[in-house]
Amino acid sequence: MQNNEVLKPAKYFSELEKSVLLALVEKYKYVLECKKSDARTIALKQRTWQALAHEYNSQPSVSLRDFKQLKKCWENIKARTKKIMAHERREKGKLFGPESNSHQALKEKVASMLPEQLYFVQNQPEEERGYNHDTSNQEMDCKRVNLLDLEVLIDEQGKIQTKPFRKVPETNLLCDDGSPPQSIDKAFSNGDLELLIDEQGKIQAEPIRKVPVTDSQCIQGSPSSSLKTESFVVPERDVYEDQNSIANMHSSESSVHSTPIFPSSKLSANRTYGRKPSQNGIFTKMHEEQHHQQMSILQLQLIQMNEVHVAKVQQIERECEMAEEEHRIKMEILNKKKMYWERKLQTITKEWPVASFNRPFPNSP
């Protein structure tokens, strides 16, 4: 009848206990969340949960739990979190539907076609700009990207085509001391466009307008003099090598020309204005994760080796105790035998004294 007794339910995990459990799971996550299912990994997970339970129970202000309860609690937390994340993804898909996906696909397609032909232009502060944008341009935080060698043509049907960029002699305006001015406009052919991509993913284009550079744009302290007009070339792959040789692309000052309307928009850049994280950062993160994984495995190995050594020491101590007990029992047996033979010898000497053995035999001559 003892098996039919009603067991009391365990206490619910408090927020403090859940935080302690999550911290310990984060510590051993590379072992507990391993996707392997071989016998060695399963045994390692079992020992890891036992070690985690030992550390959990050693924390203050927590109830004593076994590793099965901790494992079940972690599985419930994980399942609940996955359910919430799936619900958020569904809600996000309802809000941002196929329109944003089409813009994303278009920008990714253009980026895959021309990955190495773009360089980035720094946005000038508002006080340095010589003209005011339209109302729509003031509301958008746009980043400008200019193409060097190729142009991308996107017609009304959405087809993408490329053609070589027609280069025009460029002007290099230098001060008397040989240093370039603070802002230089790179000359492009008439009808060249700049791509405006706002944060919402909308793509717009406007023509590049040029303005002559005056003496006031030279470096501070340089005397005002006539500027020499020469060819100034910005190589494709050396744009980022020397910052002193980079010309900052910027919009011109007030202009009377209005923006023309084209049947097919000429785009000279794509969504790659937001540069992806550098490969070095990705490799560093991977190395850090591998390092944490190796450290967790080494820590588990040290714990296992410590447990093995403790078990060996306990076994040796038990063997020593057993040997001592066996030796004590043997000594007791030997002492009993010694006492037995001593008592027997005493009885023999009493019955047959030693002096009687020295008497001559009666029949001796």
From Swiss-Prot:
Swiss-Prot/TrEMBL keywords: Coiled coil
Asked if Coiled coil is a keyword of the record, the answer is yes
Question: Mind telling me what this protein is named?
Answer: Myb/SANT-like DNA-binding domain-containing protein 3
Query: In which domain of life is the source organism classified?
Result: Eukaryota
Domain (Myb-like): residue spans on this chain: 13-78
Is this entry keyworded Coiled coil? yes
Q: Per the similarity annotation, which family is this? A: Belongs to the MSANTD3 family.
Q: Which residues form a coiled coil?
A: 301-337
